[in-house]
Amino acid sequence: MAQRAFPNPYADYNKSLAENYFDSTGRLTPEFSHRLTNKIRELLQQMERGLKSADPRDGTGYTGWAGIAVLYLHLHNVFGDPAYLQMAHSYVKQSLNCLSRRSITFLCGDAGPLAVAAVLYHKMNSEKQAEECITRLIHLNKIDPHVPNEMLYGRIGYIFALLFVNKNFGEEKIPQSHIQQICENILTSGENLSRKRNLAAKSPLMYEWYQEYYVGAAHGLAGIYYYLMQPSLQVNQGKLHSLVKPSVDFVCRLKFPSGNYPPCLDDTRDLLVHWCHGAPGVIYMLIQAYKVFKEERYLCDAQQCADVIWQYGLLKKGYGLCHGAAGNAYAFLALYNLTQDLKYLYRACKFAEWCLDYGEHGCRTADTPFSLFEGMAGTIYFLADLLVPTKAKFPAFEL
């Protein structure tokens, strides 16, 4: 872990240090809010210049135009500036010209552009166009019966797109029956694979992606179980306790002595502290397990995740969401919003402070340096989210 991160130069939380960032109720100071807002404006200008040389054919949420539309939609929600809505609209139009008709997910497939477009058209009172996008989104489910189950390329990534639409419309535009049918497919698929590989005694559910049993949020078990425990998926209590809970407990037993988690079942190397692989993604599963099953050990494991991230989360890979400081900081915000412990808000603010010096630490440049999940757009999204910490949610993942 240590060789992949910069040593954390910051002192951990105490009340007097925290006064530079927020008051005793967790409200950010005007000075710190001003620093965040100024940096957002500065990075937006850099990003817009950089996007002129981005791949015109990449419409995805992860590295392409839909991701930039998601950022501007978020900025409109935070700041209320209608210009941001217009920017989101122009980028989502580009993304709709790039649909692949292959992958169905929010981040790496056609569901992202269609879901974001539906929400944008709704906000702009173009209801006919919004309905067209929703119809196309629902029909995506028919593309591939052998689709995997994980977040980036699988059924969970499709479910996020459906829930994203319903949340932003404030009503059930996507029928609950459609969502539950996909959820049942995920459960059945997990039971079948677990039995097939003789793992049912250890974990009643099991999932693979390209013949690997991934553990983390992006491709693996933690991301899938985080969703299966969501109230909006309406998994019944019997299945939650007989299938999901023992499978979550199986992931918990994979924990390294450090408090981190492996990227795959058979990987004994304690290296990766990313949202995609490791504690920064597993923490969401643990928090949700604590909310649903009310067992203290899940909270203890989540707090251990946060300690690992504090020590090893300022990554040399950069400042992004998938494997960078901004994505890792969201883990602190999730734990802060669960516990109201100001220590975690402080840690998020310190990681934001690291991001305020964007480009000055000698980090690796991402393949798509201005994108939502690998690059600058994701960092901007995080800095804007931090302005109202109680509303902050990891984009395209956290519900």
Swiss-Prot record:
Subcellular location per the Swiss-Prot or TrEMBL entry: Cytoplasm; Cell membrane
E.C. code: 2.5.1.18
Upregulating conditions: Induced by oxidative stress.
Any one Gene Ontology molecular-function term assigned to this protein's record: glutathione binding
Sites bearing N6-acetyllysine, chain numbering: K142
Bilayer-crossing regions: none
Enzyme class: transferase
Statement: the UniProt record of this protein carries the keyword Signal: no
Tissue-level expression: Detected in spinal cord (at protein level). Ubiquitous. Strongly expressed in brain, testis, alveolar macrophages and epithelial cells of the lung, kidney and intestine. Expression in brain increases during the first postnatal month and remaining high in adult.
Protein residues bound to Zn(2+): C276, C322, H323
N-acetylalanine, modified sites: A2
A Pfam family matched in the record: LANC_like
Recorded catalytic activity of this chain's protein: RX + glutathione = an S-substituted glutathione + a halide anion + H(+); 1-chloro-2,4-dinitrobenzene + glutathione = 2,4-dinitrophenyl-S-glutathione + chloride + H(+)
Topological category with respect to the lipid bilayer: Peripheral membrane protein
UniProt keywords, alphabetically: Acetylation, Cell membrane, Cytoplasm, Membrane, Metal-binding, Transferase, Zinc
Outcome after substituting R4A: Does not increase glutathione transferase activity and reduces cellular protection
UniProt superkingdom: Eukaryota
InterPro entries xrefs: 6hp_glycosidase-like_sf (IPR012341), LANC-like (IPR007822), LanC-like_prot_euk (IPR020464)
Misc: Was originally thought to be a G-protein coupled receptor.
Job of this protein: Functions as a glutathione transferase. Catalyzes conjugation of the glutathione (GSH) to artificial substrates 1-chloro-2,4-dinitrobenzene (CDNB) and p-nitrophenyl acetate. Mitigates neuronal oxidative stress during normal postnatal development and in response to oxidative stresses probably through GSH antioxidant defense mechanism. May play a role in EPS8 signaling. Binds glutathione.
Family: Belongs to the LanC-like protein family.
Record-given protein name: Glutathione S-transferase LANCL1
Organism: Mus musculus
